[in-house]
Amino acid sequence: MAKDILGEAGLHFDELNKLRVLDPEVTQQTVELKEECKDFVDKIGQFQKIVGGLIELVDQLAKEAENEKMKAIGARNLLKSIAKQREAQQQQLQALIAEKKTQLERYRVEYEALCKVEAEQNEFIDQFIFQK
């Protein structure tokens, strides 16, 4: 009966017969909730560490991907510039070939003219020798 009167007043005895303000069942639930909260906070901390590691890994991979992308862009630009240089060199060589062909044709015409002059001079010399 004394327990009932104390219970109505909000006072309770625990298993060690100590006077408590809270009901022992509520106290037990509070302790369990506190432990669950601690476990939850620990798990959240672990989760944050894992997520932080994943974020760092993703950032690192993103940086590596960006570096590779820049290397690829650089290589592509280098290939384009090499192609343009080769095209310019090819045009220069074609112009040089055309110039050399023109020069060759000029030399051929000059050679034919000189051969004709030589033949005329030889004929003149032959006529001069036979006349004497």
Swiss-Prot record:
The keyword Cytoplasm applies. Pfam families: IFT20 (PF14931). GO terms for cellular component: acrosomal vesicle; centriole; centrosome; ciliary basal body; ciliary base; cilium; cis-Golgi network; cytoplasm. It is found in: Golgi apparatus, cis-Golgi network; Cytoplasm, Cytoskeleton, Microtubule organizing center, Centrosome, Centriole; Cytoplasm, Cytoskeleton, Cilium basal body; Cell projection, Cilium. Residues 70-132 are annotated as: IFT57-binding. Expressed predominantly in the testis (at protein level). Expressed in kidney and retina. Expression is up-regulated during spermiogenesis. Residues 74-116 form a coiled coil. Keywords: Cell projection, Cilium, Cilium biogenesis/degradation, Coiled coil, Cytoplasm, Cytoplasmic vesicle, Cytoskeleton, Differentiation, Golgi apparatus, Spermatogenesis. GO terms for molecular function: opsin binding; small GTPase binding. The keyword Phosphoprotein does not apply. It comes from the Eukaryota. Disruption phenotype: Conditional knockout in male germ cells results in infertility, abnormal sperm morphology, significantly reduced sperm count and sperm mobility. GO terms for biological process: cardiac muscle cell differentiation; centrosome localization; cilium assembly; cochlea development; establishment of epithelial cell apical/basal polarity; establishment of planar polarity; inner ear receptor cell stereocilium organization; intraciliary anterograde transport. Cells that stably express short interference RNAs targeting IFT20 show reduced centriolar IFT20 and lack primary cilia. Part of intraflagellar transport (IFT) particles involved in ciliary process assembly. May play a role in the trafficking of ciliary membrane proteins from the Golgi complex to the cilium. Regulates the ciliary platelet-derived growth factor receptor-alpha (PDGFRA) signaling pathway. Required for protein stability of E3 ubiquitin ligases CBL and CBLB that mediate ubiquitination and internalization of PDGFRA for proper feedback inhibition of PDGFRA signaling. Essential for male fertility. Plays an important role in spermatogenesis, particularly spermiogenesis, when germ cells form flagella. Component of the IFT complex B, at least composed of IFT20, IFT22, IFT25, IFT27, IFT46, IFT52, TRAF3IP1/IFT54, IFT57, IFT74, IFT80, IFT81, and IFT88. Interacts directly with IFT57 and KIF3B/Kinesin II subunit. Interacts with IFT88. Interacts with CEP83. Interacts with SPEF2 (via C-terminus). Interacts with CBL and CBLB. Interacts with TRIP11. Interacts with TTC21A. Interacts with SPATA1. Interacts with USH1G. Interacts with CCDC146. Interacts with CEP78; regulating IFT20 stability and localization. PANTHER family: INTRAFLAGELLAR TRANSPORT PROTEIN 20 HOMOLOG. This is Intraflagellar transport protein 20 homolog. The gene is Ift20.
